């Protein structure tokens, strides 16, 4: 399969597909940190989304995709999309950054590809686009951590947990300013 892993400089997902024998390429505006420049496209992913394109990997080798990608996996930046940062727009943060991030996300959702997975935390895309097909947790896949991760899928099945472990510890953060507390409840941050 020809696989495009968008917004991935670490190459972890790309390497997993390569290990299974697929022609996978990571693409990010940053240099790759995974040690395989021959699999990394450093640049804008948007001209590549619909396939039928030529590109150069970070090692200088030219490649081409004659048809559509068989699979696109995208990790668009969540800075302006996640719920945790939405308060900043009420404090004067440029709202256009949010709209640009939504538009970027939607480029992946609307790409000419039969199989697409878009990953992002809980945020505005649940209302701006649609609810995710699935919300997963690291502890369902062998990592003792809690972090709700949304998956928007096209043509793909839901992920099945492969190694359920303890959810990990949580840290309780208490807002000590009574005026800001709602019904004197603590705010809990889990990870």
Which residues does each predicted region cover?
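Conserved active-site and SAM-binding loop architecture
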Residues: 1-191
């Amino acid at each position: 399969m020809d696989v495009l892993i968008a917004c991935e400089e670490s190459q972890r997902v790309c390497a997993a597909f390569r290990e299974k024998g697929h022609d996978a390429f990571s693409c990010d505006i940053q240099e790759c940190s995974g040690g395989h420049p021959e699999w990394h496209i450093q640049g804008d992913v948007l001209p590549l989304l619909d396939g039928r394109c030529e590109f150069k990997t970070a090692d200088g080798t030219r490649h081409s995709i004659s048809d559509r990608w068989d699979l696109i996996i995208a990790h668009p930046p969540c800075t302006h999309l996640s719920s945790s940062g939405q308060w900043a727009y009420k404090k004067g943060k440029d709202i256009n950054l949010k709209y640009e991030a939504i538009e970027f996300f939607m480029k992946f959702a609307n790409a000419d590809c039969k199989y697409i997975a878009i990953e992002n935390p809980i945020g505005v895309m649940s209302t701006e686009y649609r609810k995710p097909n699935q919300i997963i947790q690291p502890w369902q896949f062998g990592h003792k951590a809690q972090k709700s991760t949304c998956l928007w899928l096209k043509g793909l099945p839901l992920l099945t947990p492969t190694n359920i472990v303890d959810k990990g510890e949580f840290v309780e953060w208490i807002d000590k300013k009574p005026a800001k507390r709602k019904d004197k409840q603590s705010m809990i941050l889990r990870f």
